[in-house]
């Protein structure tokens, strides 16, 4: 991501606690993620926002508020998913919980995937998709949208490079549940 227009994203600590721990304002990116504003998240990322900045990073706030598209985008772009919350909750466990709760939202993307991803990635509409498959296609769409937002050129090489996500994406979700017949 390239920082543009001298916009300051990584803010300084407001003060420090009695034990010397820096106290920050909320990260703008995390705040946008918490309220589900995909457009603002994309804008901040295009300006060079730090995905993992702040005591409660954007990926966690997106998970806790159930904003799946933002979760996919941040995770695909390298957000830290291994941070445990102060109350002991594990982000990836929360993520899986939300994933299973959001079947309806995932279903809605079947037609989008057929209409848009198929043209670019050879999606076979006759092949049932399981959760893993749907995540891969959904993430490709999110990345495609983000690249378009950032006005980056789309080339076949760029598209082919996305295949590495297929190999490494969401390995912690092992269930293969056929949710689309």
Swiss-Prot record:
The lineage of its organism: Bacteria, Pseudomonadati, Pseudomonadota, Alphaproteobacteria, Rickettsiales. The keyword ATP-binding does not apply. InterPro entries: Ankyrin_rpt, Ankyrin_rpt-contain_sf. ANK repeats lie at residues 24-53, 54-83. It comes from Rickettsia felis (strain ATCC VR-1525 / URRWXCal2) (Rickettsia azadi). The keyword Repeat applies. SMART domains: ANK (SM00248). Keywords: ANK repeat, Repeat. SUPFAM superfamilies: Ankyrin repeat. This is Putative ankyrin repeat protein RF_0782.
